[in-house]
Amino acid sequence: MSHGLLIGLVASCATLNPETVTSNRMLPLVLYNFARSLDLSQKYEEGAKVARCGKEACIKYGHYQVLHSCLEIEAECDFFLGKKEESVERYREAFYICKVMGYEDDLQIIRTEAEKYLNILF
């Protein structure tokens, strides 16, 4: 299945049955998992785009459990696309969300990546 088709299916999921999306937190989680898969496959342009969609879905539907993860994926993809300023900003946003929420494991992942890629110390 092509990535474009999968993105279309996920997007239509939100328009066809929005109450399922909002009550089950399905759309942000699906978009996060898809963005992660694209990032790990080194498809950074697509990964960043899907991660941004995941971020927007988190905000739109008020389900923030994967917001920091979408930001981290977007940051990493932006770094590999040469968008260092955007990457710094996304890592910073992800870091502070994790800090406020007490997500210590994810906080360490973000610290490690930001230092490795951009020499940023949080």
Listing of model-derived features with the role each one plays in the protein:
Residues 22, 29, 69, 89, ...:
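Residue register of alpha-helical TPR repeats
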